[in-house]
Amino acid sequence: MELEKVKINSLHCNDAVLSSHQPSPSATHPQSVPSKANAVTEASIIEKTNLQHNVQEDNSYNRDCDSPVSSSSEPEKELDDLRYLHSSSLTNSVVVGKSTGSLNGAYSITSVTSKTKTLEPNSASGSACLTIAPTADHIKKRIPSSRTPTRKALRIKFYRNGDRFYPGITIPVSNERYRSFERLFEDLTRLLEENVKIPGAVRTIYNMCGKKITSLDELEDGQSYVCSCNNENFKKVEYNTGSQPLSNLTLTNSRSNSHRLAKCRPSSPLKNGLLAGSNPLPTCGGGTGNGSPHIASRSSDRVTVVHPRIVTLIRSGTKPRRIMRLLLNKRNSPSFDHVLTAITQVVRLDTGYVRKVFTLSGVSVVRLSDFFGSDDVFFAYGTERINTAEDFKLEAEEHRAINVIRKTMRTTGTTCKGPKPKMPIKSKKVYPPVVDSEAFKAATTPEDDRHAALLTSTGMEINELPSNIRNTYTLGRIIGDGNFAIVFKIKHRQTGHSYALKIIDKNKCKGKEHYIDAEVRVMKKLNHPHIISLILSVDQNTNMYLVLEYVSGGDLFDAITQVTRFSESQSRIMIRHLGAAMTYLHSMGIVHRDIKPENLLVKLDEHGHVLELKLADFGLACEVNDLLYAVCGTPTYVAPEILLEVGYGLKIDVWAAGIILYILLCGFPPFVAPDNQQEPLFDAIISGIYEFPDPYWSDIGDGVRDLIANMLQADPDVRFTSEDILDHPWTIGNQGNECTTYKR
């Protein structure tokens, strides 16, 4: 007698059918019934056989279907039902020769077809027979064969370069999600900005050994990589590889995840601290009231004390000891531990990490605020033993080195010897106002004749002007002239809005055409309230025409000539706007290379006060992908590293801005030479030594002097960044908050 294991099929099975109430063939032909013990033994053997058969079919199904079916698909539901019944068969299966007690009468098993098994009652009073679940072979035939497996996305963890406290982010990476390497850079930039403060866009990816990754194919599943911004070199530190990832972000719900996880996000060495008056960081308790007082005090301490400053470090070791400097700001000093990490990277102790820091008087530094107090010289120690009697004494050579450093940071006034220094000669001329005279305006000549007269005065013909510019704008007076270009004031015929038309003569730029292309390319990328906007560009064989935003007040050089010097409040407005423009440029990896008063346009009110400042003239601007070596710029504003030809980057703009801020407050530059001779001027710039002479600086506070001293550091590594300018207390303050004490 053929015996089969009984499995009750789920009611969800679409192939379930009800068998007719007919006598079972096994019931009409009497057969010998085995003993109860034999029946149980035989049923157990058959049950094991069917169990192995079902496991083989399940494995075959898994091999055929590499990509799992959606949980809502009908075949998977059937297969789940089959597996569920199979898993429960050891306890709920009907065994031949035994009554289950759940149906009326005993049951016998009959094989109806190869695909369907039915259960029928022996007695006429039994209920309808139930159909057994279809086999796995039948389910496999119903699964669409056109389904192809998709490539699994790689799970990659990314760290911030040099940030050993940041736990990293884990995101899926695949060729389907990222069609190009640049697209991955964009998403990493966005995701990192939600967690840490980064100095710019992600431009390079390294593996944990420092090897540069150049394509998506080089990324490996489950591995970690380091993101670098603004072409920073790889920093080999102990990244936080042992911690849990900050968030397993997906690109579809990154904003919601970021908002959810922000409540308990730890501090990062590159997270920009909050400005005074900003809301404090949320705590893990969900609010300031429920948070830990210790955490709240640390956050408040960071907000109030951290500001950009340069400190001097004395490395422990054999005397005379090495002396170096470090720029502390809100990006590398959000906590005490982060400052120790920054010091470790600079001093490079033989014993490893810096564990202990002392002031020059031997007082242990234990709080973040101690780095931003009156002391600016610190001893850095690792695990070595400290000899308090000898280690805190400076030798004569060490004293001299510290005094040289302090000389570059000196903000005290000195008596001016000789006549007052003068401003340098303006680097570009402005045409006399005869072109804009009332007689010329009242002339009855046709408009084209007026345009022709204006252009003829510059050696150009009216027919050379592009038709779309000639038909859209009316030509006004000449407002400026450079080495290669002429600037007209123009007015839109329909709206009446004023614009500036810059005409670049290509014949005067032979061999320098790349500067023109770079200017247009850079300006098309820019959109900032303190940067002149490019409205239209027309390229012709002989000239390049640029329609630009017009600023009514003229350039800053003329404003300085008229008023000689500005107040601190007026200077603060202008340096804020210039700092914001530079920060925007530098975040995009763009350096201006020619920041000077002639290229800064100002908007004035009726009393002559500056309301707004805008950065213009991007003829020398370029993207910074590596150190630059081209010697360019204006002598008075050129940085030392340009003159030394050792390579320069974004911080040359900060140097030029420091020169301008100095000029705004006293009316002359910090570095001057008799008769404007270049060689003595360049020697003075390279030395980096200047003064704040009285009486011109006697009424100017220490706050702005400190800012200038940090912007005019000859060493670009410790020179302020454009963001540090905006974070400085003097820049943040106002007229009623200029009493901050600055000690050196």
UniProtKB/Swiss-Prot annotation:
Stored InterPro entries: Doublecortin_dom, Doublecortin_dom_sf, Kinase-like_dom_sf, Prot_kinase_dom, Protein_kinase_ATP_BS, Ser/Thr_kinase_AS
Name the domain of life this protein comes from. Answer: Eukaryota
Pfam families referenced in this protein's UniProt entry, alphabetically: DCX, Pkinase
Q: Which GO terms describe its biological process?
A: intracellular signal transduction
Domain named Protein kinase: residues: 473-731
Where is ATP annotated to bind?
I479, G480, D481, G482, N483, F484, A485, I486, V487, K502
**Which keywords annotate this record?**
ATP-binding, Kinase, Nucleotide-binding, Phosphoprotein, Repeat, Serine/threonine-protein kinase, Transferase
Q: Which residue windows does the record flag with biased composition (Polar residues)?
A: 17-35
Q: Where is this region: Disordered?
A: 17-38, 54-78
Q: Which residues form the Doublecortin domain?
A: 154-240, 309-392
Catalyzed reactions: L-seryl-[protein] + ATP = O-phospho-L-seryl-[protein] + ADP + H(+); L-threonyl-[protein] + ATP = O-phospho-L-threonyl-[protein] + ADP + H(+)
Q: Which cysteines are joined by disulfide bonds?
A: none
Active site residues of this protein: D594 (proton acceptor)
**Leading EC class:** transferase
State one molecular function term (GO): protein serine/threonine kinase activity
| PANTHER family cross-referenced by the UniProt entry | SERINE/THREONINE-PROTEIN KINASE
The record's similarity note reads: Belongs to the protein kinase superfamily. CAMK Ser/Thr protein kinase family. CaMK subfamily.
Q: What is this protein called?
A: Serine/threonine-protein kinase GM11705
User: Which species is the source of this protein?
Assistant: Drosophila sechellia (Fruit fly)
